[in-house]
Amino acid sequence: MSRKGSTPQRTVLPDPKHGSETIARFINMVMQSGKKSVAEKIVYGAMDVIGEKNPNAIELVQKALDNVAPAVEVKSRRVGGATYQVPVEVRSSRRMALAMRWLIDSARKRGENTMPRKLAAELLDAAESRGGAIKKREETHRMAEANKAFAHYRW
């Protein structure tokens, strides 16, 4: 850890098409090997697919992210010779990062034929509280609930 204090939060410019900082972060997380134009095509393609069914795609993406974002997670804490899984609250910036990561990972595992369709299907499912990303959040919450007895080890 840094001794000089916390690092400042990096700012992300809003995306050019929708003017949304959330969509810009989402594009950056979809990006692999620095190929931003490919990531933009994937995200905008997914939003076009969503737009066919729902006129306001940005609101649906935001709803999906809110549904997937975890409230608590477990962190390992070593006490004596034992390692405990201690439940801790998730701060807001990490909540969004985890939600985006889980949505993208779940979308990549789906069976649809193209990545924009996979991402669109996962976002639609997440907005309706179902799908792989929601399962991941539920699993995380279950782990925190099961280890609630160790909450006093919080740091």
From Swiss-Prot:
<comment type="similarity">
    <text>Belongs to the universal ribosomal protein uS7 family.</text>
</comment>
<comment type="function">
    <text>One of the primary rRNA binding proteins, it binds directly to 16S rRNA where it nucleates assembly of the head domain of the 30S subunit. Is located at the subunit interface close to the decoding center, probably blocks exit of the E-site tRNA.</text>
</comment>
<dbReference type="InterPro" id="IPR020606">
    <property type="entry name" value="Ribosomal_uS7_CS"/>
</dbReference>
<dbReference type="InterPro" id="IPR005717">
    <property type="entry name" value="Ribosomal_uS7_bac/org-type"/>
</dbReference>
<keyword id="KW-0689">Ribosomal protein</keyword>
<keyword id="KW-0820">tRNA-binding</keyword>
<dbReference type="GO" id="GO:0000049">
    <property type="term" value="F:tRNA binding"/>
</dbReference>
<keyword id="KW-0687">Ribonucleoprotein</keyword>
<dbReference type="GO" id="GO:0019843">
    <property type="term" value="F:rRNA binding"/>
</dbReference>
<dbReference type="GO" id="GO:0003735">
    <property type="term" value="F:structural constituent of ribosome"/>
</dbReference>
<dbReference type="Pfam" id="PF00177">
    <property type="entry name" value="Ribosomal_S7"/>
</dbReference>
<dbReference type="InterPro" id="IPR023798">
    <property type="entry name" value="Ribosomal_uS7_dom"/>
</dbReference>
<comment type="subunit">
    <text>Part of the 30S ribosomal subunit. Contacts proteins S9 and S11.</text>
</comment>
<keyword id="KW-0694">RNA-binding</keyword>
<protein>
    <recommendedName>
        <fullName>Small ribosomal subunit protein uS7</fullName>
    </recommendedName>
</protein>
<dbReference type="InterPro" id="IPR036823">
    <property type="entry name" value="Ribosomal_uS7_dom_sf"/>
</dbReference>
<dbReference type="GO" id="GO:0015935">
    <property type="term" value="C:small ribosomal subunit"/>
</dbReference>
<keyword id="KW-0699">rRNA-binding</keyword>
<dbReference type="GO" id="GO:0006412">
    <property type="term" value="P:translation"/>
</dbReference>
<dbReference type="InterPro" id="IPR000235">
    <property type="entry name" value="Ribosomal_uS7"/>
</dbReference>
